[in-house]
């Protein structure tokens, strides 16, 4: 039986605070107190607080999320980013259908309403809990971020309309055969690239996927390494692990297993893995150096890293850095190329190569209807190698 040095950590408790918090404004929430005799647009706007009084019981992030009431026709993020910043001002800007993504309104879960804290100032445990809550909601929603097939049938142009035949995954670099080879339910459209394309996985190898989600990349890797190989998926969200394990039988993937754990504390034995892959997950980790350090630990000498992730190409505006949805939606947590190289070097890796993919701005620009995120982000391939042991 395989043993590992780091036990799976218990789910952290989210710290609470009594400081003023502003709830996210949408058509289906009621974050403002309305003065009698006025309509909703003239309402006096009073911020709600995480605790009504010093003696009241603090609310958890999940409780705060449940407190936001939603109607059947609710559309998350119904207000523009500028309107939210103005604390409730309306906007008549038309909302054009956009490519489904991690920030898609289809799969967006209600998150913590603390939009006053910069990413760098957030407690790591709070960040992990926010990410866990978001992707637990996606896992249990019964659909991927782009519906059944990743297409927006509403028309009006856009990359998911009838004007393109490519699915969301094909736009990320997968070919049609890749998509067709994996059973429904595993491809949730949560990536920003295709690690299989450059991981050079070989038959008989052991592959580890950091943040494996419902298992799409794991099942593709299983086809590459064959029955003599082994694939391990690690995810910190119990709901995702359950969904991935259900997909094992659907894909007849006996050489794939999924383990609950954090990618900074991998439940994997030392020097037991040939290849580490990941797809748009490392940016979500609040302590990235720890992720690379533990990745180095589990790799065999000569083992390699093949990661697809977003990298920051320009400084984020303050409202992006303070937006919880930007943090959990693979935007605000992105690092620069130089910072990533420094962290990989610090972990001990050699042959570090990070190649931004300029063409990725086409789909990244569609991640947010109110802002062109392609001005700040680009998808990149991240490759590195653990030095071989001298015999």
From Swiss-Prot:
Enzyme class, UniProt record, top EC level: transferase
EC number: 2.1.1.137
Protein keywords: Arsenical resistance, Plasmid, S-adenosyl-L-methionine, Transferase
GO biological process: response to arsenic-containing substance
Polar residues biased stretches: 28-39, 102-116
Bias-annotated ranges (Low complexity): 40-65
CDD domains cross-referenced by the UniProt entry: AdoMet_MTases
Disruption phenotype: Deletion causes increased sensitivity to arsenite.
Pfam family, one: Methyltransf_31
Catalysed reactions, semicolon-separated: arsenic triglutathione + [thioredoxin]-dithiol + S-adenosyl-L-methionine + 2 H2O = methylarsonous acid + [thioredoxin]-disulfide + 3 glutathione + S-adenosyl-L-homocysteine + H(+); arsenic triglutathione + 2 [thioredoxin]-dithiol + 2 S-adenosyl-L-methionine + H2O = dimethylarsinous acid + 2 [thioredoxin]-disulfide + 3 glutathione + 2 S-adenosyl-L-homocysteine + 2 H(+); arsenic triglutathione + 3 [thioredoxin]-dithiol + 3 S-adenosyl-L-methionine = trimethylarsine + 3 [thioredoxin]-disulfide + 3 glutathione + 3 S-adenosyl-L-homocysteine + 3 H(+)
InterPro entries from the UniProt entry: Arsenite_MeTrfase-like, Methyltranfer_dom, SAM-dependent_MTases_sf
Disordered as annotated region, ranges: 1-126
Induction record: By arsenite and antimonite.
Family that this chain belongs to: Belongs to the methyltransferase superfamily. Arsenite methyltransferase family.
Protein name per UniProt: Arsenite methyltransferase
Organism this protein belongs to: Halobacterium salinarum (strain ATCC 700922 / JCM 11081 / NRC-1) (Halobacterium halobium)
């Amino acid at each position: 039986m395989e043993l590992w040095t780091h036990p799976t950590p218990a789910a952290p408790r989210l710290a609470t605070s009594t400081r003023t918090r502003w709830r996210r404004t949408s058509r289906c929430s009621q974050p403002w107190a309305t003065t009698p005799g006025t309509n909703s647009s003239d309402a006096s706007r009073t911020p709600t607080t995480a605790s009504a009084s010093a003696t009241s019981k603090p609310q958890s992030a999940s409780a705060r999320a449940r407190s936001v009431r939603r109607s059947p026709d609710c559309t998350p993020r119904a207000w523009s980013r500028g309107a939210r910043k103005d604390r409730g001002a309306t906007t008549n800007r038309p909302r054009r259908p956009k490519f489904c993504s991690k920030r898609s309104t289809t799969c967006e879960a209600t998150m913590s309403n603390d939009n006053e804290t910069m990413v760098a100032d957030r407690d790591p445990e709070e960040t992990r809990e926010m990410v866990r809550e978001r992707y637990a909601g996606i896992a249990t929603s019964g659909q991927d971020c782009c519906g059944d097939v990743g297409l927006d049938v509403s028309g009006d142009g856009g990359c998911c309309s009838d004007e393109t035949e490519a699915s969301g995954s094909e736009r990320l670099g997968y070919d049609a055969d890749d998509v067709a080879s994996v059973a429904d339910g595993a491809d949730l459209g949560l990536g920003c690239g295709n690690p299989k394309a450059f991981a050079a996985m070989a038959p008989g190898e052991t592959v580890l996927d950091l943040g494996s989600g419902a298992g799409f990349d794991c099942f593709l890797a299983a086809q590459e390494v064959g029955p003599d190989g082994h694939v391990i998926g690690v995810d910190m969200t119990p709901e995702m692990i359950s969904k991935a394990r259900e997909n094992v039988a659907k894909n007849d993937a006996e050489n794939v297993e999924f383990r609950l754990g954090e990618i900074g504390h991998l439940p994997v034995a030392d020097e037991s893995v040939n290849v580490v892959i990941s797809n748009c997950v490392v940016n979500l980790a609040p302590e990235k150096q720890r992720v690379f350090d533990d990745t180095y630990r589990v790799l065999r000498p000569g083992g390699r890293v093949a990661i697809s992730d977003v990298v920051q190409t320009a400084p984020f505006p303050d409202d992006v850095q303070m937006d919880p949805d930007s943090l959990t939606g693979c935007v605000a947590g992105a690092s620069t190329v130089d910072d990533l190289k420094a962290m990989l070097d610090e972990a001990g890796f050699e042959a570090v190569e990070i190649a931004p993919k300029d063409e990725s701005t086409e789909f990244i620009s569609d991640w947010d209807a109110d802002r062109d995120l392609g001005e700040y982000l680009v998808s990149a391939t991240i490759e590195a190698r653990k030095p071989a042991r001298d015999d």
